[in-house]
Amino acid sequence: MINGKTQLRVLMSGCLLTVAAGSYAWSADAKAGKATYDKLCVSCHGADGKGNPAMAKALGEKGLNVVAKDVQAKKDDELLKVIVEGAGKMPASGKNLSQQEQKDVLSYMRSLAK
């Protein structure tokens, strides 16, 4: 029979593994984000994140530079909202991307500013 101390250890180990697995599942992967960015974002935001001038002119938009200090200063949840819901002439991607893909593309976007 297992004593109370052993039961507590088993329970705590299970909790720690659950938390660790959850953290791993939701950690952002910039490399995976690049693939999504290249597929959905690069035509407007450019390979370097500074925006595509021709596309900006065609759309009449100025906010295509995702590495700009004011964009990078925004909190993740603010930027994820734009990715999911769209903004201005930027289409919403929420229906096309999983939550993991959304976080990955945001991670890649952040990496462009470094």
Describe each model-derived feature in a short phrase:
Residues 12, 50-52, 77-78:
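Short hydrophobic/aromatic-rich motifs at helix boundaries and adjacent loops
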